[in-house]
Amino acid sequence: ASTHEALKKVGAIIERPNFYPYMTALQNLKLVCKIKDVEEDKIEEKLELVGLLERKDSKFKTYSLGMKQRLAIASALLNDPEILILDEPTNGLDPQGIHQIREIIKTIAAKGTTILLASHLLDEVEKVCTHVVILRKGEKLYSGRVDSLKASFGFFELKTSDIDTLHSFLKGNEHFGEIKIENGLLTAFLNTELDAQKLNKLLFENGIVVSHLVKRKESLEEQFLELTKNAKA
């Protein structure tokens, strides 16, 4: 009984949205309410939340893939779950559909619902999630806040006519850790905080003139690749 009660507090969309094609959104959600044994008074509120209230009387078969996905989210919210589980919610959608789903996810989260989201799109995780768990072959590689994972000091991309001198100088500098050279571009990863202006001044004072100097932060994707690469090693 306790498991049954707990599941009542969970909403989930695990596979592609599946509703009766010849029924309207409203009719489909009324049927879901009967199955879930919940009142129908939340239907319009949930349709409005996902931006489908104006299309409530349209048949499901007339909906685009993005609209179908939004209807599935509305359906999963009918019992006001404390936890919402979404499996690759933007899979197969166009850019506009992806943006709409992400905004809906943020709105739901802001109302106090915990969302568990499975995604292979790291850009998505970076944009909508506060915490992340990275798994590889069932093994946990990282668990914690997204911003903590990204809290590296970043790295510099540099070009100069004398790349060897630049490499030697940076190698002996405490600010830098790993240094890579590829196709004439030197990438130097920071161990501590250092801004571009200070580095440029430091190089110039040591007789090194660069033609290209850009500071970047590692994206979640780059961090993920680094983590999984280390795990393989």
Predicted feature descriptions by range:
Residues 3, 40, 146, 163, ...:
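Residues at or immediately preceding the N-termini of alpha-helices
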Residues 1-117, 122-136, 142:
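ABC transporter nucleotide-binding domains
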Residues 34-37, 229-233:
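Non-catalytic alpha-helical coupling and interface elements of nucleotide-dependent molecular machines
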Residues 22, 228-229:
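Extended rod-forming repeat segments used as scaffolds/tethers
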Residues 102-190:
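ABC transporter nucleotide-binding domain
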Residues 25, 146, 217-221:
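Structural motif detector for alpha-helix initiation sites
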Residues 155-227, 233:
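Short, charged/small-residue-rich alpha-helical element at the C-terminal edge
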Residues 7, 29, 44-47, 99, ...:
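Generic structural signal for individual residues within well-ordered alpha-helical segments
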